């Protein structure tokens, strides 16, 4: 049994990256590292007896930290479910490619994307574009994220990360809590959604994820 890792960097990866990875596993003869393109590497890693999903997740973070320090290269990593045999390798590659795409699109603040932990991002990625557009119009009408400044969206994202805790969010943003409340009230005035309420917060978060997804799809189609 094995795991397939897919590593991607925003800059071209040279031989240094491969050498650093090989040095990270000096006694593992059955590790295979293959360039996919100038920006991606695939690595086939044999699963040891007793290896857990947490071990694999930690390994991905170890690779990220090591490459950052020793190869001066920042990477994001997706990995597959456990591969029982090599016949399942094509399916595993599809898993990692999907995990990397969904991860970068919906969880860009993260660096590791397990295929089996994509959450709601995988569901949204499979929705038809027309259904997404209908949902956005139902929620926002003619209002889009462009009507909200980047600072407000960043504050909202931090607010969600802190489980709708106003005091903690304000502290982390070095912002007076009344300023944060004012921004949340402005969003409510524009959208009708009170982000201090869990249901409205979830609706807004999903809507923003869908907006980002549609924008990404349109950017790809214009390339």
Q: Where do the PLM segments sit?
A:
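Cytosolic nucleotide-utilizing catalytic cores of signal-transduction proteins
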Residues: 1-223
């Amino acid at each position: 049994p094995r795991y397939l890792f897919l590593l991607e960097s925003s800059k071209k990866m040279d031989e240094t990256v491969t050498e650093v990875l090989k040095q990270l596993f000096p006694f593992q003869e059955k590790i295979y590292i293959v360039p996919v393109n100038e920006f991606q590497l695939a690595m086939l890693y044999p699963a040891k007896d007793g290896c857990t999903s947490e071990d694999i997740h930690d390994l991905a973070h170890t690779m990220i930290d090591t490459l950052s320090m020793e190869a001066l290269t920042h990477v994001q990593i997706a990995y597959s479910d456990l591969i029982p045999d090599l016949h399942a390798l094509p399916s595993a590659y599809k898993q990692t490619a999907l995990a990397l795409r969904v991860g970068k699109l919906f969880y860009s603040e993260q660096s590791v994307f397990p295929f089996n932990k994509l959450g709601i991002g995988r569901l949204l990625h499979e929705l038809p574009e027309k259904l997404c557009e209908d949902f956005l119009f139902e929620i926002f009408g003619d209002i889009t994220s462009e009507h909200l400044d980047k600072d407000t969206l960043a504050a909202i994202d931090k607010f969600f990360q802190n489980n709708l805790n106003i005091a903690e969010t304000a502290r982390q943003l070095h912002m007076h809590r009344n300023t944060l409340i004012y921004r949340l009230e402005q969003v409510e005035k524009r959208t009708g959604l009170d982000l201090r309420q869990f249901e409205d917060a979830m609706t807004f978060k999903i809507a923003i994820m869908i907006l980002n997804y549609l924008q990404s799809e349109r950017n790809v189609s214009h390339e």
